[in-house]
Amino acid sequence: MYKRQTGESVAVKSLKVSAEFSQWLEQHIMLFNSHITHVSGELHKSVWQRFLDGDKEINKGLDMIREAGLLMSSGVANESTQDVIDAMRLNSAGVDILGSELHQPFRDILQPQTTSGVVEAWKAMGAGGGGVVGIIVSDTQYKGKLIDDLTARGWSHIPWQIDYDGVVRSEVSL
């Protein structure tokens, strides 16, 4: 299930993808802790100030992030790996409009990986303050190399897999 906001309402839709697409996601999306952390409020202070000052570029960046979310939702629903990649790229472009400093610590390390074709797309996870980065690797043959390269720079690979059950609550009678 996922929720999609349309105007003032939220539409709830069931989301079921094939085992093959789920496997592609698990094999191509990698998470890393860069150990580069920020105080989120400080990191975003200039963005909020620009927003309050009416900077139209902030609205443009936020609109791009929204479009990226919609494209990602559509990409997953339609099992389009290219849309998933494009959505992550669009999100990163939107974040860069908000403030290049948000991605700068990661960009310095990941740009060569992107230029060389190892990385298709990447983005700071969440608001970016925690230092975790999601990466879409172009081919699974590069995973080991990417892990080696990034751990040599002090980053930690975070293994993950899709949680098909979600939160399961059970009561135990004592």
Listing of model-derived features with the role each one plays in the protein:
Residues 125-131:
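Short Gly/Ser/Thr- and Asp/Glu-enriched loop/turn motifs at secondary-structure junctions
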Residues 3-123, 134-174:
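C-terminal nucleotide
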